[in-house]
Amino acid sequence: MSHSVKIYDTCIGCTQCVRACPTDVLEMIPWNGCKAKQIASAPRTEDCVGCKRCESACPTNFLSVRVYLWHETTRSMGLSY
């Protein structure tokens, strides 16, 4: 089961989530329109195990990274059985 990893605009590019991930799902890359020292992450969700360590490591009050487990996303779309 793959999980959905969403990085929000409140990300400050500190890389705490990248370092916390045990499966190297997150990678910091430059993005179009980025300002000095701002970076975005490129999640490889097929390797995500859903441990949510990236969420715990996020220092922003806005929780800039979220992991949605497969059953959370299917429930929100009305696809659960």
Swiss-Prot record:
One of its GO terms (biological process) is photosynthetic electron transport in photosystem I. One of its GO terms (cellular component) is chloroplast thylakoid membrane. Keywords: 4Fe-4S, Chloroplast, Electron transport, Iron, Iron-sulfur, Membrane, Metal-binding, Oxidoreductase, Photosynthesis, Photosystem I, Plastid, Repeat, Thylakoid, Transport. The keyword Ligase does not apply. It is found in: Plastid, Chloroplast thylakoid membrane. Its EC number is 1.97.1.12. [4Fe-4S] cluster 2 binds at C21, C48, C51, C54. SUPFAM superfamilies: 4Fe-4S ferredoxins (SSF54862). The keyword Iron-sulfur applies. Binds 2 [4Fe-4S] clusters. Cluster 2 is most probably the spectroscopically characterized electron acceptor FA and cluster 1 is most probably FB. It comes from the Eukaryota. Its cofactor is [4Fe-4S] cluster. The eukaryotic PSI reaction center is composed of at least 11 subunits. NCBIfam families: PS_I_psaC. This is Photosystem I iron-sulfur center. It comes from Dioscorea elephantipes (Elephant's foot yam). The lineage of its organism: Eukaryota, Viridiplantae, Streptophyta, Embryophyta, Tracheophyta. The gene is psaC.
